[in-house]
Design a protein with these regions (language model features):
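Nucleotide/phosphate-binding catalytic cleft detector across ATP-hydrolyzing
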Residues: 1-236, 255, 279-281, 288-330, ...
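A short acidic Gly-Thr/Ser loop motif
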Residues: 27-33, 112-113, 237-244, 250-253, ...
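Basic, amphipathic juxtamembrane/active-site segments
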Residues: 43-51, 251-271
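Glycine-rich phosphate-binding loops at beta-strand->alpha-helix junctions
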Residues: 113, 192, 291-294, 356-380
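A conserved active-site cap/scaffold subdomain adjacent to cofactor or substrate pockets
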Residues: 262-286
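A general structural motif
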Residues: 336-345
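Hydrophobic, well-ordered secondary-structure elements that form the walls
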Residues: 344, 363, 411
Length: 448
């Protein structure tokens, strides 16, 4: 893992250099769409002591100067499946954003939604020889524990300290200069499939771009869609994309768990296409314009003209004038959405979400906009549920403030104001890359 440590530090330095030059692109590669926004930076901002160790990661103010979205191609379950098609789509979206911004970008930060994420927790503890916590003590405690293997072909995507303790004083965001005898840390580590990560890196390079960072789409969506109190007191963000549904849990303003359900809104569209025998573009139109999950007595009488949007007239009167009731449409959509939510429920149960002090659930992503989803999710998940829109950032167009762009906005926030990661610290050479892990569920229940 020494190579990983150095690679992440290199990307972090590339991000800082791009920000110093003033321009950095954010690239959200999803199953249904690919979005690129170009950020203009005003230089390093003032570090905020309340955000943790903070200065290691570096923070800056920014505004959006270019933005473009196109249909995704070659991506399945949030992972690149057909390299050539995805490359063409990425080139197209980056060129569109560059044209609007009037600048050329060379460095991008990208998101990854699939890749079979797995959460782990780790704990480290050291003795303070000086009786006070210094910068090197923070680095030493992060490298203090031995590590079992993550498994073959796994890569670390995030490794964030979420809690420090000095002697009996726990819940510290920044332990530096605290007086004591022992320093302990809890850290959340998120790993992903290495092949999916390598394919993303290869795609970016084929587009003549340099990768200045990679972030979890579920983590990014949570940063954008959860309000400050939810991130502090505990909440789950459910990012319902086209091919995958990301799950992230936040507590004390840190992500402490992440996973994904390999189902999304595209399956709902496919069910409509097969159930009503209509093309996929017609099924998508029916889902977005007339879809729903809660049937009423009037839905049997509300007829939707399908033939008018299926394509050119065929000459067959019954086909060209075909209609379906909204009740039939809801009857097709609801079982699949229930299946997705059941998968989310299983993930939350495995994470011990019921033990959280606050059990707020925030739905975001494109599929979260289906009418009636919040009510259905409330019954299945058994929690307080709301639909979350991403935070407004300066210069962002209105069409990019919808829930489907939560991960994009969160990735911009992550680029400008990253939380500290393991590789932000100067590790002792002999210990860099040596960290101890426990399964996240056990760690979560024991430490929070």
């Amino acid at each position: 893992m020494r190579d990983l440590y150095q690679a992440q530090r290199t990307m972090r330095q590339m991000r800082r250099n791009a920000m110093a030059r003033g321009v950095l692109a954010v690239l959200d590669i999803g199953t249904s769409k690919i979005t690129c926004i170009i950020l203009q930076f005003d230089g390093p901002g003032q570090f905020r002591d309340t955000d943790g160790v903070g200065p290691m990661a570096g923070q800056s103010s920014f505004r959006v100067i270019g933005q473009f979205t196109t249909q995704s191609r070659g991506v399945r379950y949030g992972e690149i499946d057909t390299m050539g098609e995805t490359e063409r789509a990425v080139r197209h979206v980056v060129q569109g954003a560059q044209k609007q911004a009037g600048v050329r970008v060379d460095h991008v930060i990208a998101s990854i939604a699939g890749a079979r994420p797995a959460s782990y927790g780790l704990a480290g503890e050291i003795t303070l020889t000086a009786g006070k916590v210094g910068e090197q003590d923070v680095a030493a405690v992060l490298a203090a524990c031995d590590a079992p293997d993550f498994g073959r072909g796994r890569e670390v995507l995030h490794a964030q300290p979420v809690n420090f303790a000095v002697d009996a004083r726990s819940g510290l965001g920044d332990p530096r200069d605290h007086v004591g005898n022992r320093l302990a840390v809890d850290m959340h580590v998120l790993t992903i499939d290495g092949t999916a990560a390598s394919n993303l890196v290869q795609c970016i390079r084929r587009c003549d771009l340099e990768l200045a960072g990679v972030g979890s789409a579920a983590y990014a969506a949570g940063r954008a869609a959860l309000v400050e109190d939810e991130q502090e007191l505990g909440a789950a963000c459910i990012d319902m994309g086209g091919g995958i549904t990301g799950v992230s849990i936040f507590l004390k303003k840190h992500m402490i768990f992440a996973d994904a359900v390999r189902m999304g809104g595209d399956l709902v569209t496919r069910d409509i296409s097969q159930g009503l025998r209509v093309p996929m573009h017609t099924a998508e139109w029916l889902k977005t314009r007339h879809g729903g999950l809660e049937a009423t007595g009037r839905d049997d009488m509300e007829m939707i003209a399908v033939g008018a949007v299926s394509g050119p007239e065929t000459g067959d009167w019954e086909t060209d004038r075909r209609t379906v009731s909204r009740a039939d449409l809801i009857g097709i959509m609801r079982p699949r959405v229930e299946e997705i939510l059941d998968g989310v429920r299983a993930v939350l149960d495995a994470a011990g979400f019921d033990h959280m002090p606050s059990r707020q659930v925030v739905l975001t992503g494109g599929a979260s906009q289906i009418p009636g989803l919040d009510a259905l999710a409330g019954r299945i998940l058994g929690q307080n549920v709301r639909i979350g829109r991403p935070l407004r950032i300066q210069g962002l167009a209105q069409q990019h403030t919808a829930p489907c762009h939560a991960a994009t906005v969160g990735l911009a926030l992550h680029a400008a104001n990253p939380q500290d990661e393991w590789w932000d610290f100067e590790m002792p050479v002999e210990r860099a890359g040596v960290i101890g892990l426990k399964r996240a569920v056990r760690w979560f229940r024991n430490n929070w």
